């Protein structure tokens, strides 16, 4: 505002059948208001605002009838340090976005074969079967800043291209952020039938170490932040079928499929 002239104009809807005397009276009132001077309320020589009568606000019944005019040079329309505040807000938004992107960006989840062992061996003489309880261990390394879930695990044991055992599990484990976790599971494999000679080989007392080679294919499904990935491992293992609780060493480990 300032030492300037202002007007509070009354806008009324005029119809063609309005009384000419009323229109003339309204025009005279508008001209009288337009010539009414005022200065800032905070000024030293200020006078009472004609529209609000010093109350600091316009009465509700006159909100839609009065218009306040503010000079473009009024300092209240130009807040101090506006550019600094806007720049600081932009920088803070960029920093927050960068941190969120860094911590939520998917990092690698590695799945490795940590070896197997035969925890139990039993023989079915009637059917010439060798039953192996093969306990396998997977090492899962989570490099993310949030936990990941092992939602599904499937493993299959083969001997001479014949499937002799399988294992399936859901909701296996939850891997904490930035950590390694071992997942153990046991597959029951029955070797016999067309391979009945394995029974006679594994029960032959003249042989001290009864080694056979089995092939394992393991698929692990991992889920995190609405994303699901799968890793598949294939490996050949040398196992002793002649005694229980025998630790074995892998002959060949061939990872297959995408590592997360």
From Swiss-Prot:
Cysteines joined through disulfide linkages? none
Query: Which residues are sugar-modified?
Result: 171
Q: At which residues does the record annotate a lipid attachment of kind N-myristoyl glycine?
A: 2
| GO CC, any one term | endoplasmic reticulum membrane
Q: What family does the entry list?
A: Belongs to the TMEM106 family.
The record's note on quaternary structure and interaction partners says: Interacts with TMEM106B.
Q: Where in the cell is it found?
A: Endoplasmic reticulum membrane; Membrane
Q: Tell me the InterPro entries matching this sequence.
A: TMEM106, TMEM106_C, TMEM106_N
The main location class comes to endoplasmic reticulum
Tell me the organism's taxonomic lineage: Eukaryota, Metazoa, Chordata, Craniata, Vertebrata
Q: Which residues cross the membrane?
A: 85-105, 196-216
Which organism is this protein's natural source?
A: Rattus norvegicus
**Lipid bilayer topology:** Multi-pass membrane protein; Lipid-anchor
Q: What is this protein called?
A: Transmembrane protein 106C
């Amino acid at each position: 505002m300032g030492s300037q002239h202002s007007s509070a104009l009354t806008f009324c809807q005029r119809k063609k059948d309005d009384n000419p005397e009323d229109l003339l009276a309204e025009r005279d009132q508008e001209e009288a208001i337009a010539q009414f001077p005022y200065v800032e309320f905070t000024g030293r020589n200020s006078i009472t605002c004609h529209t609000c009568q010093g109350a600091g606000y316009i009465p509700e019944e006159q909100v839609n009838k009065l218009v306040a005019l503010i000079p473009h040079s009024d300092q209240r329309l130009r807040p101090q340090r506006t550019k600094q505040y806007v720049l600081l807000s932009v920088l803070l938004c960029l920093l927050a976005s960068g941190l969120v992107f860094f911590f939520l960006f998917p990092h690698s989840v590695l799945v490795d074969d940590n070896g197997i062992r035969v925890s139990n061996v039993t023989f079915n003489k009637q059917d010439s079967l060798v039953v192996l309880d093969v306990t396998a261990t997977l090492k899962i390394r989570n490099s993310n800043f949030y936990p990941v879930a092992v939602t599904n695990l499937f493993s299959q044991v083969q001997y001479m291209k014949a499937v002799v055992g399988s294992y399936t599990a859901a909701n296996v484990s939850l891997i904490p952020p930035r950590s390694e976790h071992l997942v153990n599971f046991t597959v029951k494999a029955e070797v016999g039938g067309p391979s009945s000679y394995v029974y006679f080989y594994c029960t032959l007392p003249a042989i001290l170490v009864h080694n056979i080679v089995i092939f394992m294919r393991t698929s692990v499904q991992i889920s995190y932040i609405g994303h699901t990935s799968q890793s598949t491992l294939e490996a050949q293992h040398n196992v002793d079928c002649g005694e229980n609780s025998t630790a074995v060493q892998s002959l060949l480990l061939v990872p297959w499929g995408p590592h997360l």
